[in-house]
Amino acid sequence: MSSKHATETARRRTFAIISHPDAGKTTITEKLLLFGGAIQLAGTVKGRKAARHATSDWMELEKQRGISVTSSVMQFPYKGRIVNLLDTPGHEDFSEDTYRTLTAVDSALMVIDVAKGVEERTIKLMDVCRMRDTPIMTFINKLDREGREPIDLLDEVEQVLKIQCAPVTWPIGMGKRFKGVYHIHNDAVHLYSPTHGGKIQHGEVIQGLDNPRLDELLGGQAAELREELELVMGASHSFDKAEYLAGRQTPVFFGSAINNFGVQELLDDFVEHAPGPLPRATESRTVDPAEETFSGFVFKIQANMDPQHRDRIAFLRVCSGTFSKGMKVHQVRIKRDVKISDALTFMASDREHVEEAYPGDIIGLHNHGTIRIGDTFTQGEQLIFTGIPNFAPELFRRAHLRDPLKMKQLQKGLQQLCEEGATQLFKPLTNNDLILGAVGVLQFDVVAHRLKAEYNVDASFENVNVQTARWVSCDNARKFEEFQEKAAANLAIDHGGDLVYIAPTRVNLQMAQEKWPEVRFHATREHGVAA
């Protein structure tokens, strides 16, 4: 491996933020970008009507509702490292998109609201991280408000999320009594100095817990802090890098992201300790980031990042080798060589053309309908990266057009929006219905809104007699043909061209499985791999 490739790979830190909605994920995303020098002015998310919206929530509907529904990617340099931050949807209906984003990162940051503690969505996301032993750092947010006792929160994280907590910073009071944090490793008190927006103002730093200046400024709270810390140090774990990298321990930081406080301490430790690019599993072997030849996989497709150009961008995670502009790469699924001269890098919606990209980087490829989620790109080797799932939807609706003459635009719009992977399109074999499947109700609203805004199609979604769907496959070609003839009324083609059994009831599905034992019914399907 060339020394430049080795150096650049070692500099990369690629991570995502996970949290329950409203724990402050978008705010902390903004502040990380602010401290990383990537944006001059953080647009606070609360002022949704204001002209400045949070940088990472760039799609129109997100701006209206104040929730992030698509993962965007932001890159910024910090202390000699290159940080790739993947923002994930904050709404539970978009769990599949979040799940796939978590396949493209090497570590994660968990944000917890000090008043609410561990919430349901956080538990689900942690389960996903645990499946891959993803290293996790934790930021307990909103210390400028009243909340629960920090020691109780650590206990809850340990009990509910089954991960050891190692506090790195410790809060001095909270709400009106919030005075700052004590950095355990550096033996320094960082005094709270709230600033908003783009101002970074560093409060006074007092070296040493026994410094008389502390008593002078904090009065009785200084003695309280010393007492509390004695208790904390005795009851909690001290930071162990090997345990953190194995996904068994989480370093914990406290702060108030909206007030730009406590974020820099987190970022400093993150670039120091978080893992660089890790090896990746394929169907045939494990790919090491140090390998010379380029490889990567697509974990997300986003339509219309630029409403002026009706474009679709495929987000590719570089896994090995160096990507350089104008390079010829091999798209494994369709066995086609393509030259890529206009790949993009991201600063939320601002796009710049890539000259070179290294393992850990995320690049955007222009997609004209030929790239799918899960696609592997290499320099010729027939590799398929694994672990990028497609889930069977839980809710189904039939598309209803207000103007029947717009059928062509509706089909095109649904096909393109479904390529993003948050919703799935099914075309029954025996009628002309267009059935949309989703994980949650919000997705139908999003699709209707985007059809109107981006394709000028006025459509609504009505109930349809479908309760569940399964991808079907069979090794016996004759039996499969017979099954397709006899069960045609329940079969549909999905937007990837695969055959799906759509069942009106769970009982119907059970009966079909009993009647056709040779046919396999799949609840999930690997992207990039036919069922």
Swiss-Prot record:
Gene Ontology molecular function: any one: GTP binding
BP GO terms, sorted: regulation of translational termination
GO cellular component: cytosol
Span of domain tr-type G: 10-278
Binding annotation for GTP: 19-26, 87-91, 141-144
Family statement drawn from the similarity comment of this UniProt entry: Belongs to the TRAFAC class translation factor GTPase superfamily. Classic translation factor GTPase family. PrfC subfamily.
NCBIfam families reported in the protein's UniProt record: prfC, PRK00741.1, small_GTP
HAMAP family linked: Rel_fac_3
Name the record gives this protein: Peptide chain release factor 3
UniProt organism field: Thioalkalivibrio sulfidiphilus (strain HL-EbGR7)
